[in-house]
Amino acid sequence: MRKLLNTLYVTTPERYLALDGENVLVLEEKKILIRLPLHNLEGIVTFGYTGVSPALMGACAKRGISLSFMNPNGQFLASVSGENKGNVILRKQQYRISDSLEDSIPIARNMIIGKIYNSKWVLERATRDHALQVDVDAIKKVTANLDEHIRQLLECDSMDRIRGIEGNAASQYFSVFDQLILQNKEEFFFENRNRRPPLDNVNAMLLFAYTLLANECAVALTAVGLDAYVGFLHTDRPGRISLALDLMEELRAVYADRFVLTLINKKTIKPEHFVKKENGAVLMNDTGRKTMISAWQGRKRDKIKHPFLGDKIEWGLIPHVQALLLARLIRGDLDEYPVFLWK
């Protein structure tokens, strides 16, 4: 099993990254703030424009360390990767499946079944753990509808229909999402999904969590030899990591949404961690991003039992395991994609 290493997140735009021997340096105005051995890292994510030295880019590419660039708001800009050592036959088969609706539909269908199942689990967990604080009847009505969406998917053989069911299910799920926010509801409330830009604190947190998750899915797919830009459910678009977006669908609710809710309900994230722009956009400030990233790294260390493998592994390895299982399906070693179903 792959070892879970650390990811270095650089959230302050003024920081510059450089190489010193076998170490990465984080500098500000030529002053060394952090020195970390490269062999302890599996990825570097930087939120800013100051830059990274060509020497460090080359060292990361050579060692297979992912290097991703985001703008200060968390929007993906670019990534640096080295030689793809995956089997070219695997990627050619991935492209064939992507071009074939008949072959893509079963994979996309399983991924969306997983997304809806896990969304339902998050809601059911809330009614079990917080029955006196949530509207149990309203949530149960939604979970019954989600069950019906899963039944519809089991018989669905149209990609457009799969996308339509997914959209309806997401709308149902988010219609009661505000029920799951139990603390500081004056500042943390949810009315609807808005993302470009986020217009409230909760949507700002969801956007940031989804950005982190999408990046980790892209890194995992690349590591197993797949092309993160060629998906089955999400169509090809220049610059879009379509397969990473496919893979993260089943993980959104249990990996990202629950994480955001935990930070709010435990009061880890506070109202002062956000800034509101003149255009109404609400963004996390530097302190908020650092707090969220620190908690994200801790969450990745938690152990769970993988529902398909039966092994206890760290949460942070789930994207990698699912990428491996997807690669096995594409190679023909599995009959269907074993979507992650949290129990």
Residue ranges and their predicted role:
Residues 1-72, 82:
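Terminal-proximal segments
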Residues 40, 48-121:
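A surface-exposed, charged beta-strand/loop segment in the N-terminal or early-internal portion
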